[in-house]
Amino acid sequence: MTSTRDSQDDLPVLVQQNHSPGVLTLTLNRPNQYNALSEDMLAALQRALDEIAGRDDLKVLILAANGKAFCAGHDLKQMRAHPDKHYYESLFATCSQMMLTLTKIPQIVIAKVHGMATAAGCQLVANADLAIASQDARFAVSGVNLGLFCSTP
């Protein structure tokens, strides 16, 4: 099991686990923030996906999450702390690259969804090859209420 730490909370934002040969689980691990995609989380996902893409021994990638939610989308608190155009352009370019990588890796990607999956969190699910949702799973793109629209792949 490996993890990448969040500089804000010093918690592992992403946990990797091999449960059986050929299957790897990446678990989003910012449960107190509903697994919002912080800069650290996006970077950790990109690094993990780049590494996974080159592994012939892995056939299946499961995206999971700890806590009450799968993923609340971008970290709005972090976004509000940087209210300038260049920050948003960089953030969305980073997210777009990660989402594109997710769609292009050779492994089958399964999103294991519980709780809410909103905005970019809903995009994570949409970019998976297959989604398995619990009875309590909820999907939304509520950013339109803030003048935002999810436009990455």
Listing of model-derived features with the role each one plays in the protein:
Residues M41-L45, L91-T94, L124:
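Hydrophobic alpha-helical membrane-association signature
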